[in-house]
Amino acid sequence: CYDDWGDFEHVKRVDTGLLGAELTTDQASGKYKISKIYAGENWNESRRSPLTEQGVNVKEGDYLIAINGTELNGSMNPYELLENTVGKTAELTVNSKPETSGAKTYTIRPIASELELLNLNWVMERRKMVDKLSGGKIGYIYVPNTSTDGNRELYRGMYEYNEKDALIIDDRYNGGGFIPDVMTNLLERKTLSYWQRNGLSAMKTPGIAHNGPKVMLTNGYSSSGGDAFPYYFRKKGLGTIIGTRTWGGLVGMSGNAGLVDGGYISVPQFGIYDENEQWIIEGVGVSPDIEVVDRPEQLAKGIDPCIEKAVEVLLKQLQDNPVKKVNAPAPPDRSKWNEQMK
């Protein structure tokens, strides 16, 4: 399955601090310009965006004049000045003009990786895309894995899009995990009853449930639990699968003992089969109901073919079978209850 080294010396890495932003060189002034600042979730350390934290008034389009007092020009690499700043603070001097006069200096905390911010940006772009294409009727939930993060994002999305007519569940690039069945059960929930509290909006039981149509997106990087998730989704009849065939890897390993030198060798230990006593998914994957290939040249232009097809399919389903909106009835005349019970 997998192996890893033991008592080998590891090269000590030099951590370079990152800003959660894109820098471009302004040819006219020879200064660096902050062309994009990635939005973050600053309560979550893995998604913290340094330039959006409280007290840091840096905007897209500002010029990065200096780092830790060293003035920058276009021939310098700004990240050299951010070496060994992870877990520490750094001073950024910025200005709306490419000059030092009127510049302001902010103390920020650089981050070690921008991967989560880039992923969050990708997700937010698709949320906006779905909202625009569907006229606000469809919600979009990206599920990065079938473990802690994926379960959290699914719950958050189900809360946020509780009132949407339809849902897109994006399983593309899903890294797997051990709870795809739990997540599928959440998608399967239907509303059992409604509650009207005086003066407030109606509530429902269960609090997280969605009654409308759903689509799941897959690709060749939907792996392990990301294979099982669409398989269970289809088996429960929850909706249409769109995209390309999944990775096809559900022979697994767990609990392998380590070796004496600190390394390990993991051995395949279990595989998946169905009620017909047939081995499934491994080496084959889960094929979509509608095949759509995400062409690189289209993605580079900001086009997401799977998203567009999913919206098209769901809007057609909503047109053919509109979701019934359940409204609270008029308040009951409780004086007549005794008569009604006779």
Where on the chain are the PLM-derived regions?
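Extended boundary segments
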Residues: 1-27
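Cleft-lining beta-strand/loop regions that shape enzyme active-site pockets
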Residues: 6-12, 33-35, 41-52, 65-263, ...
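Active-site-adjacent "gating/activation" loops or surface patches in catalytic cores
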Residues: 21-44, 58
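A generic structural motif
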Residues: 24, 93-97, 273
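Conserved functional hotspot residues or short segments at active or partner-binding sites
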Residues: 94, 282, 300-301, 305-308, ...
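Metal-dependent DNA phosphodiester-chemistry modules and their immediately adjacent helices/loops
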Residues: 128-129, 222-224, 259-291
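C-terminal or mid-to-C-terminal helical accessory/interaction module adjacent to the motor/catalytic core
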Residues: 291-298
